Amino acid sequence: MTKENEIGRRQAIIGGIGGLFALGSSGVNAQGKTNLTFWTVRLNTPELSAALKGVLASFEAANPGISITHEPVSGNLVYPKFLAAVRGQSMPDIAEAFSYHPLQFAALDQMEPMDDIIALWKSNGQLDNIFSEYAYKKFYWRDHYWGVPYNLDIRPIYYRKDLLLAKGLQPPKTWEQFQAAAIATNDPGKGVFGAVFPAGNFHIAQHFYMSFMFQAGGGILDKDGNLIFGTTAKDANVRALTFLTDLATKHKVTPPGIAAHNTDDSMTLFVQGRSAFGFGTGGMISRLMKENPALFDKVGILDVLEGPAGPKGRLTAAFYNPMFVWKHSPGKEAAKTFIKWFIQPGRLEPLYRTVPGQHWPIFKSDIGTERVKSNRLLEEALTKVVPYSTDFAYPGFGRPEMGVIDGEKMFAAPVNEVVVGTKTPEKAVMDAHNEMKKLFT
């Protein structure tokens, strides 16, 4: 590939992100009412949309001079829609979207800085109420905050308490204990596998790989935002990839077909009772409650595992997802009024009640609700997973390139390639690093 072609590709990826929001702002009508368009990516199921409708109605009642038009965007179509509508330059006033979008849009000079909201939160104590400083630091680039966090999306490992008890095992806390427990509980003859995880070339595969990278002492960026995936972090990242994929290739404790699994495929097998350990989203809690309530009391959530990096590496990948405002919105101040109202402790409780576990508040003060206290798995996720959840870029932040690395599934491919058998862990890591490196040159 020539240098000119490579630059064109990179610009098409980074520069082509803006097109999702080709809907257009509504502005101010003849009656002086500000009409705002609000695009959502992860609040679009019928249940969540109904709950959101009530939240938006409450805002409009409290702010009669502002109306909100909610427009859902299918998560499966987000990236194609970005590229298809890149030339539209007609974005909504407000959006909630994928984790790194504010930085990518800021690189296009399309984002309104959110420094004033961060300053407000700092002055009123709300910033200290957020679980992790990386929830907002991730949106800091070139001296400005380009988004603010509103939601946390976690990646727990679930386990069957009854199957471990039958083998005389305690819930594992280390890599070694986890591997041994997955092997001991694997009984495909009885329709139960030791572990199930999504190894298809989908975004979810890299989420769990990221957790093991942290636990091995690896990562993608260093604290200064430099790419280290295949350099100083190479050995740790290879070790993490080997540990994860060995479950399928060496120990053979996973069901057939995980190389084609996306999120719901692996979670479905666990919800059906066909695996001792299941890698999933927080939404697994809701699925257990709805689809197999008899299994609920037999399921627990693991502590974040300790790997080669020791206690300091007990971290798990998660997403602090953003809200942001279009730079050219005619209703920027009204949009910020909405965001400041929307992101308040307790405000989104109707959403959290609708799909337990799928969405998590970012505020520490939201954890003591009756909703959490009355649900054992929510409490376990809260104490065992949420405090250890951090961003993909950790310990770095503020790199728009991370949106491309995540969006193009650059470290999901290694998981799939090793499970399928087309590459060794070392080659898969180095090939991925070389693709990432093109974004930083």
Model-derived features with residue positions:
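Extracytoplasmic "Venus flytrap"/periplasmic binding protein-like
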Residues: 54-130, 162-173, 269-277, 293-294
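Conserved C-terminal helix/tail region of periplasmic/extracytoplasmic solute-binding proteins
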Residues: 165, 249, 387-441
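N-terminal secretory signal peptides and thylakoid transit peptides that target proteins
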Residues: 2-20
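Glycine-centered hinge/linker elements that transmit conformational signals in sensory
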Residues: 182-184, 226-258
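C-terminal lobe and pocket-closing loops
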Residues: 119, 283-295, 308-410
